[in-house]
């Protein structure tokens, strides 16, 4: 009899089963679910429920008052981050697409988040990040084109206060980042970002197998 776990009858690996269980264990409210649907409609990526929940936990653990997000999308990750931040916390979220930010703003409004708690900046993150103050942020979340990860990591670490954390999404690239035979531009950039974090003595990193891989690091 064919397995019901896979159309081809192949059972998922233990690792795949654990990740699937982690994702299925998270319930999203109607506002986040609606934002996720809009992300699909507009072709914008969105973090998985388990990744979102982890972002909320990290924001809570760092008692985040100031957070930077690179890649606003439809506001899914922003909603999760805000749910874990302090009530007086401010999320600065950057996206090159004004339409993404318009849709995200709708999600924030639906969630009852006051305008003073979000700062939406439309522009290239490469330009915006350099204008933000050193060591002024509790959490930096990078969810952008993998080829830009090294530059964003350098800027993100600069922004972190002592005790803060940086999180880089798409750190696994579907497993390609760990494939010795893969060496395309995305893989090379992701590996360089990981090297920058690993060699920074101020950082304690961990690679988390959720979503497309999360590389997280806490700053001493």
UniProtKB/Swiss-Prot annotation:
One GO term in the molecular function aspect is: O-methyltransferase activity
Annotated positions binding substrate: 143
Keywords (alphabetical) are:
Methyltransferase, S-adenosyl-L-methionine, Transferase
Q: Which SUPFAM superfamilies match?
A: S-adenosyl-L-methionine-dependent methyltransferases (SSF53335)
EC number of the protein: 2.1.1.-
Q: Kind of enzyme, top EC level? A: transferase
Query: Which residues make up the binding site for S-adenosyl-L-methionine?
Result: 47, 69, 71-72, 77, 95-96, 145
Mind listing the GO biological process terms from this record? methylation
User: Which InterPro entries does the UniProt record give?
Assistant: Cation-dep_OMT (IPR050362), SAM-dependent_MTases_sf (IPR029063), SAM_O-MeTrfase (IPR002935)
Q: Is Transcription regulation included in the keywords of this UniProt record?
A: no
Family to which this protein belongs: Belongs to the class I-like SAM-binding methyltransferase superfamily. Cation-dependent O-methyltransferase family.
| PANTHER family linked to this entry | O-METHYLTRANSFERASE RV1220C-RELATED (PTHR10509:SF85), O-METHYLTRANSFERASE-RELATED (PTHR10509)
This one is known as Putative O-methyltransferase Mkms_4069
